[in-house]
Design a protein with these regions (language model features):
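C-terminal-most transmembrane helix of multi-pass membrane proteins
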Residues: 1-9, 46, 207-209, 215-220, ...
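Juxtamembrane helix-entry segments on the extracytoplasmic side of multipass membrane proteins
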Residues: 6-12, 34-39, 43, 60-66, ...
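Specific transmembrane alpha-helical segments of multi-pass solute transporters/efflux pumps
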Residues: 21, 25-26, 53-98, 106, ...
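Transmembrane alpha-helical segments that form core, pore/gating elements
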Residues: 27, 49-53, 105-107, 111, ...
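Hydrophobic/aromatic residues within transmembrane alpha-helices
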Residues: 32, 41, 85, 111-113, ...
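Helix-helix packing/entry segments at the starts of transmembrane helices
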Residues: 43-44, 80, 94-101, 163-186, ...
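C-terminal transmembrane-helix exit sites in multi-pass transporters
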Residues: 52-60, 101-123, 247-267
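Hydrophobic transmembrane alpha-helices of multi-pass small-molecule transport proteins
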Residues: 53, 75, 117-137, 153-157, ...
Length: 307
């Protein structure tokens, strides 16, 4: 087997690790920011993440920064629209509808770029959606404005995943990460400055800790690893891995907070965890070179005549 398929496991594992960090930070900071304006928290978080990248400013490639800024626009708008939708719909509906990005990624890639998704990956998409449904525990009862807003945010996250997969192969990962962080920061600042945004209150000590954790691990490190990993992963495969975030949040919620969860939700989380493994193994098997056919021995009479 060639070394390339084996190396593809490393980006997948790193993306899993980042997704686990995102799930962990959700559990760690949710109580600290429950009464803090979301737009302001995101603005402070991304501002600190940008500050953490300042030692690398002299080495940035500005063409890659510009490309990353387009990614950040979709990511920033997706965050804001999701936040607005969350205020007018159920949290369970938000989690399920946001997870639709795992379907939107292959759909958009096929419609726009004519990218065909392998059958095993499509099966993985179905398994991931089933796992998410079991984890959330219910289908939306009826579509409302909030549900449509959350669906729009899922579209934004899907576009972000696709653009990262496409741009990361041709651009410097640090510059691409900085670009999307800065443009998302601009959107969060504008959102916080609106009458409904809540302004920029002074963070408490617990909120400052939450900002520091999410800025360093979930944003600066997390977005960089996502960009680097997606250079070698298909966009749909990446989406399946990223969909495990709510399962990681549940896992850390049980471990750190002792939150009780019914068996059906645990089964959903287990299915979400298993799906990326299934898709990755299927991809490795598809890339495995087929054994060469044994050469036919030369005819003895022909060999003698040719000598």
């Amino acid at each position: 087997m060639s070394p390339r398929p084996r190396l593809a496991v490393i980006p997948a594992l790193l993306l899993v690790a980042v997704t686990a960090i995102w799930g962990w930070t959700f559990v760690v900071v949710k109580d600290a920011v429950v009464a803090f304006p979301v737009a302001a928290f995101l603005a402070y978080r991304f501002a600190l993440a940008v500050a953490l990248w300042t030692p690398f400013l002299r080495h940035l490639r500005w063409r890659s920064v510009l490309a990353g800024s387009w990614i950040g626009v979709f990511m920033g708008l997706a965050f804001i629209v999701q936040t607005v939708g969350l205020h007018v719909t159920l949290a369970s509906d938000t989690g399920l509808i946001t997870g639709l990005f795992v379907v939107l990624v292959p759909a958009i890639e096929w419609v726009v770029f004519r990218v065909r998704v392998p059958r095993a990956t499509l099966i993985g998409v179905g398994l991931a959606l089933l796992g998410l449904l079991l984890l959330v525990g219910a289908l939306p009862r009826q579509l409302a404005l909030g549900d449509l807003l959350v669906a729009l945010s899922a579209f934004g996250f899907a576009v972000q995943i696709i653009l990262v997969a496409r741009f990361s192969r041709h651009h410097d990962p640090v510059s691409l990460t900085v670009g999307q962080t800065v443009s998302a920061l601009a959107i969060f600042i504008l959102a916080a400055a609106t009458p409904m945004g809540g302004g920029f209150p002074v963070p408490s000590a617990s909120v400052l800790v939450a900002i520091a954790i999410t800025a360093s691990l979930a944003t600066a490190l997390g977005l960089f690893v996502q960009v680097w990993a997606q250079r070698q992963l298909a966009a749909t495969t990446s989406a399946i891995v990223l969909l495990t975030e709510p399962a990681w949040a549940m896992f850390f919620g049980v471990w750190l907070s002792g939150n009780p969860f019914p068996p059906i939700r645990i089964a959903g989380a287990a299915l979400l965890f298993a799906t990326p493994v299934f898709v990755t193994l299927a991809a490795l098997r598809a890339r495995r070179p087929k054994p060469a056919k044994a050469e036919e021995p030369e005819d003895a009479d022909f060999a003698v005549a040719a000598s």
